[in-house]
């Protein structure tokens, strides 16, 4: 059994649904799905293909109602305050004491192959270790890493990426980590760059169990290199996403768009932060012949024109 945790708001519903569906489709294990949502606690927001999926064991959705002082760096960014909700997961998930571990997944991650064995094995290793969290080690250029170390006052150069986290629930509760992380957040509020990821790193200072890259593989939409067959989960890392016009023209956006299509929500998921930029990327994609990478170019043209009439998205 996999215990998955997602935290998101209404602006990220489709992205979250697509990510969740990819895990349900690829996993050989049943999945307990726990959602902390900014706007609702109603299950009827989920598509039927998720609600009736044979791999879904249980779905619990909780509306975030915790009053907190601040959620730094979310204004005018591609990240919402919902990224911070995972700091409070143990206040929401029912019967949390029955869980050995929970795996948090970012909404911009897509499961390509069955990750069950690796998640279960790494969860066991985490529980048997001294660590409370398991994550992939981040790879920064030396200059950037030096800035982060100085900014967060770290003694370790081991900095984790929080896109996929395996959490030892018992250690988290026993060590009162929610309170300690909130205290750390307020201490470093003015130095935060990478949202709650910085909070985790400032508190843990390199003390985490390291996951393989196959469970959190950075997918760069600046090139068209194919992802290795060993990769289980791709992470659309950074602010260039496969549901934006610029991102869709990249071959690797198909991992996301194919799953969105299988979910039954439409042919293409397209959002706009600034329509003028989207139109420019659209025209450039056609003249550069990048449109040949799309499986359904005519459907994309139609969906793009329709999407221009919809409310702009913040992401």
For each feature predicted by the language model, list its residue ranges:
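N-proximal low-complexity "stem/linker" segments adjacent to membrane-targeting elements
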Residues: 1-21
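Active-site-proximal specificity loops/subdomain of glycosyltransferases
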Residues: 46, 51-95
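Short internal beta-strands
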Residues: 32-39, 135
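Conserved donor-nucleotide/metal-binding helix-loop-beta segment in metal-dependent transferases, i.e.
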Residues: 109-146
């Amino acid at each position: 059994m996999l215990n998955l945790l997602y935290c998101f708001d209404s602006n990220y519903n489709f992205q979250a649904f697509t990510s969740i569906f990819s895990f349900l489709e690829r996993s050989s294990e049943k999945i307990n799905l726990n959602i902390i949502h900014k706007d609702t606690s109603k299950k009827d927001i989920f598509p039927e293909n998720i609600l009736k999926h044979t791999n879904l064991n249980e779905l619990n959705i909780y509306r975030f109602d915790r009053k907190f002082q601040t959620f730094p760096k979310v204004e005018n960014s591609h990240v919402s305050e919902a990224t911070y909700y995972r700091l409070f997961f143990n206040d929401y998930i029912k019967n949390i004491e029955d869980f050995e571990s929970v795996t948090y997944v970012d909404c911009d991650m897509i499961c390509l192959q069955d990750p069950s064995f690796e998640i279960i094995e790494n969860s066991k290793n985490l529980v048997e270790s001294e660590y409370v969290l398991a994550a992939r080690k981040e790879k920064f250029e030396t200059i950037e890493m030096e800035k982060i170390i100085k900014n967060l006052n770290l003694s370790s150069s081991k900095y984790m990426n929080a896109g996929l986290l395996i959490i030892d629930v018992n250690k988290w509760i026993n060590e009162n980590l929610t309170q300690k992380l909130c205290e750390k957040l307020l201490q470093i509020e003015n130095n935060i760059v990478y949202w709650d990821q910085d909070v985790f790193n400032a508190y843990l200072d390199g003390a985490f169990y390291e996951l393989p890259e196959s469970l959190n593989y950075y997918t760069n939409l600046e090139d068209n290199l194919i992802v290795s067959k060993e990769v289980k989960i791709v992470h659309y890392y950074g602010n260039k996403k496969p549901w934006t016009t610029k991102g869709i023209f990249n071959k690797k956006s198909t991992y996301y768009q194919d799953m969105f299509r299988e979910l039954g929500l439409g042919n293409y998921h397209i959002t706009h932060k600034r329509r003028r930029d989207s139109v420019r990327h659209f025209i450039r994609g056609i003249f550069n012949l990048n449109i040949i990478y799309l499986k359904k170019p005519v459907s994309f043209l139609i969906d793009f024109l329709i999407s221009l009439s919809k409310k702009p998205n913040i992401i």
